[in-house]
């Protein structure tokens, strides 16, 4: 479970941070446009380097290796608890990345190729900005999202066979669902889960049509990842 006191302190500090950050690049906007379309105002969105998140850590059980996002990385020893630290944090229209994870472009070769992990991270955090900009629909506030970390050992975990109502999930789960959609669309656009996720998202945002085949080359974080059947 995440240290919510430390995370709350970070949120408070970021609220007073005056760093402007950068706008999404043209490639990033093109990529995010396939998910959020015009329901996200990219002109108001800023990506900022230097989120003070090193002191924020959380321990969680291993997640089942049934999702695309879990199967593109190496397995961990059975029963091992996972200790991690956030790579980024979204606050209103700004996304604060740790220095290790801040990049000048998260989609540098798009649409010809996709750096999958970087694109998934961007899509997850952009979904929090979408939640804020569409808060009349989502009911989102940063404090509500923060509370999820004190009530669940893993607020990002979702059931791949769960409800088809996107807004029925927690805010971090919604970001993770978008990550999973990016992963499945990139690697298995005709798979059953890809279609389910697409149909779920299409109810709340103007997600673009699914392609009939893979749209671009995909850079994976693990060379031994098995792509066949990854989103069935």
Predicted regions and their residues:
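N-terminal secretory signal peptides that target proteins for export/translocation
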Residues: 1-3
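A metal-dependent hydrolase signature that marks the N-terminal structural subdomain at the beginning
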Residues: 19-76, 98, 103-104, 202-232
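A generic secondary-structure signal for well-formed alpha-helical elements
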Residues: 36, 130-134, 182, 186
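Metalloprotease/metallohydrolase-associated module, dominated by Zn2+-dependent proteases
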Residues: 27, 33, 83, 90-92, ...
């Amino acid at each position: 479970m995440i240290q919510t006191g430390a995370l709350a302190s970070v949120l408070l500090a970021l609220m007073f941070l005056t760093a402007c950050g950068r706008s999404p690049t043209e490639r990033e906007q093109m990529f995010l446009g396939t998910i959020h379309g015009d329901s996200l105002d990219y002109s108001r969105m800023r990506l900022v380097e230097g989120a003070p998140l090193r002191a924020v850590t959380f321990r969680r059980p291993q997640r089942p290796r049934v999702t695309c996002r879990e199967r593109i990385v190496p397995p961990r020893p059975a029963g091992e608890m996972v200790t991690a630290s956030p790579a980024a944090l979204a606050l209103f229209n700004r996304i604060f990345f740790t220095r290790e994870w801040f990049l000048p472009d998260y989609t540098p070769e798009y649409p010809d190729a996709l750096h999958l992990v970087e694109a998934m991270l961007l899509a997850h955090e952009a979904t929090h900005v979408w939640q804020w900009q569409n808060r009349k629909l989502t009911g989102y506030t940063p404090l509500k999202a923060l509370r999820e970390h004190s009530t669940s050992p893993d607020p990002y975990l979702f059931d791949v066979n769960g409800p088809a109502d996107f807004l029925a999930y927690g805010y971090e789960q919604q970001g993770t669902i978008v990550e999973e959609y990016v992963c499945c669309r990139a690697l298995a656009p005709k798979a059953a889960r890809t279609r389910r996720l697409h149909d779920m998202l299409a109810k709340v945002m103007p997600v673009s049509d699914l392609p009939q085949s893979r749209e671009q080359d995909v850079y994976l974080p693990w060379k031994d990842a098995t792509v066949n059947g990854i989103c069935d």
